[in-house]
Amino acid sequence: KLLDNPELSSARLCSYVKGPDFPTGGQILNTPEELKNIYITGSGAVRLRCTWEAGPETRSTKTIHVTSIPYMVNKSQLVERIADVIIARKLPPLLDVKDLSTDEVRISLELKHDADELMVMAYLFKHTPLQTNFAVNLTCLVPTEQPEVGRPERLDLHQVLWHFLRFRL
């Protein structure tokens, strides 16, 4: 679209760019307006949270399966942090954590039968890396009159894409 209409504003480009795409998945908590503001100003933070689902229940336990984790979160360290919460008994309804991942992320949390899943997840979002902020800073080296010297500058979405297209063409 930018090649067809070089005058497109960053605000208009945001209608084509829905939001950041993180390789580990996760849920973006920012509103569309907040994401648009990040693209227009060239800085901000994207709030990321794991995705999870309730698993099967037995008579004595409930299960939660974490199916994706925020970008740049080390899965084994995350499991250790959750295990530390269990060992310290900071969250009594949480009984066990298991990493059942193969090609895809799957962390199993075992809860007491009468536990409130939302309360457990809210605690884990606050006290573990299951919810994080990912800083966005669109600072780039912009070409100057001297081809071998670039000048750092914070850019908006339009400027980043325009400089990229000029570089590639």
Q: Can you annotate each of these PLM segments?
A:
Residues K1-L169:
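C-terminal interaction appendages of subunits in large macromolecular complexes
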